[in-house]
Amino acid sequence: MSYKSDIEIARAANKLPIQEIGAKLGMKNDDLLPYGHDKAKVSQEFINSVQGNEDGKLVLVTAINPTPAGEGKTTTTVGLGDGLNRIGKNAMICIREASLGPNFGMKGGAAGGGMAQVVPMEEMNLHFTGDFHAITSAHSLLSAMIDNHIYWGNEQEIDIRRVAWRRVVDMNDRALRQITASLGGVSNGFPRETGFDITVASEVMAILCLANDLKDLEKRLGDIIVAYRRDKTPVYCRDIKAEGAMTVLLKDAMQPNLVQTLENNPAFVHGGPFANIAHGCNSVIATKTALKVADYVVTEAGFGADLGAEKFMNIKCRKAGIAPSAVVVVATVRAMKMNGGVAKADLGAENVEAVKNGCANLGRHIENVKSFGVPAVVAINHFVTDTDAEINAVKEYVASHGVEAILSRHWELGSEGSAPLAEKVVELVEGGGANFGPLYPDEMPLFEKIETIAKRIYRADEVLADAKIRNQLKEWEEAGYGHLPVCMAKTQYSFSTDPNLRGAPTGHSVPVREVRLSAGAGFIVVVCGEIMTMPGLPRTPAAESICLNEEGLIEGLF
């Protein structure tokens, strides 16, 4: 049986005018700032007007460690939202925006897939409403103002060897990881080493996604540490006087984007920090607004539960004062096989034994999710190559962990295929079994926070960090930053820092290569192993297959 591509399905969607989608949430036409007919920004006035409403229930969708192609977490998020609406619940979804770089590299789009998509899919995976361009521009403005400050006399006495603020671009470009700037003569400034990160790794992105309003945004931007003086005292963004202009550039980007699913259910798509190099959750302002206008809000956190869900619980929920009522762990038969040692080329063939071996990875994620005090259900995201024997093997394993696994066919059937999952989620939420608590208290020393995550979530034996890193953490504690949560930057493919170490490894070590203080965002980034904050393109990038056809339509984009 042949299936339409995601882009063919999205183009055939029967979209409603965005004003009709907003009306489902109590929004009047004046509450929306339309970008065409099918997407809009939500006004700050509307957001302010619903603050007195009672909060709905929050459901987190996370996953096992992914295969390189991803496991359909966004697809499941969309499918579950549609499924909840199908069974009579007032539900909406909150997901992240797509980064251009990975879309032209190897990752799937950020709009779901099959019959569980958010539309307009093409625009969402490209420029959308321009939020990422605004973030890149605000970040770049600060970069320019730092070098300009140094050029015109360096009143703040910045040590040009200790400029912490790098540049960003929303593209996978390994050639820019490490560069020398200001070459070409005296008129171009003082030459120094710097580099580029991808926009989704920018602290500006993290700040936008954690800020409560424009006032909070401007304060957080001012708190960014951009450099250090020779006496090692920090230079802040506010010392460069950049936070006001940066806020102006981000004014519209702070407003959540409203779009719709294929089944005309509302969706907020806002913000997009990566989960392997940042905190991996959509914006606080979108999630908290959704909770005021819907009874059920389904959101996702990037990559596996060891990264996205851990940061959702320890960073986003802690900072935003929210708590999930249930967690859905997405698993696929093919990922079980890969974690069980099967090569990517052989994933289509039945291999029940490999599925059983790979289930240890799923079991670890279930244990970790439950350790936060939140009830869980496993969603088996169905693929046409899955066999009954393989599916039953997953169900039996999950049952042994005291959790139910539901086969969900939302990719193929939309809400009809996800209704059983939706029913189970409602059962968990209404059962009132959630007693959420983060993994560590604010007052725990920073290095102990790192060890807590490494040992309790990754099941490592030890954290390897040299004296320089440990001393840096102590200095930050003495400077008043010891209460901040830690944001682990590591590979998404394994519980360890080795992407090839599949399954549920124990007894491994977590090497810390670098620590970065994101004072504006409000967390410490802990860079582990070989993770890069600027990805590269694969040998055959997806961009090679993307073009416009004779009708002016995009081809090759999913």
Curated annotation (Swiss-Prot):
Pathway as given in its UniProt record: One-carbon metabolism; tetrahydrofolate interconversion
**Keywords, ordered alphabetically:** ATP-binding, Ligase, Nucleotide-binding, One-carbon metabolism
What CDD domains does the entry give?
FTHFS
- Swiss-Prot/TrEMBL GO biological process terms: tetrahydrofolate interconversion
EC numbers listed for it are 6.3.4.3
An example Gene Ontology molecular-function term: ATP binding
Give the domain of life.
Bacteria
Q: What reaction does this catalyse?
A: (6S)-5,6,7,8-tetrahydrofolate + formate + ATP = (6R)-10-formyltetrahydrofolate + ADP + phosphate
UniProt xrefs under InterPro entries: Formate_THF_ligase, Formate_THF_ligase_CS, P-loop_NTPase
First and last residue of the signal peptide: none
Could you confirm whether the keyword Ligase appears in this record? yes
Q: Which Gene3D superfamilies match?
A: Domain 2, N(10)-formyltetrahydrofolate synthetase, Formyltetrahydrofolate synthetase, domain 3, P-loop containing nucleotide triphosphate hydrolases
Instruction: Give the residues the record marks as binding ATP.
Output: T67, P68, A69, G70, E71, G72, K73, T74
Q: State the family named in the UniProt similarity comment for this chain.
A: Belongs to the formate--tetrahydrofolate ligase family.
- Its recorded name reads Formate--tetrahydrofolate ligase
Which source organism does the UniProt entry give? Answer: Ruegeria sp. (strain TM1040) (Silicibacter sp.)
Gene that produces this protein: fhs
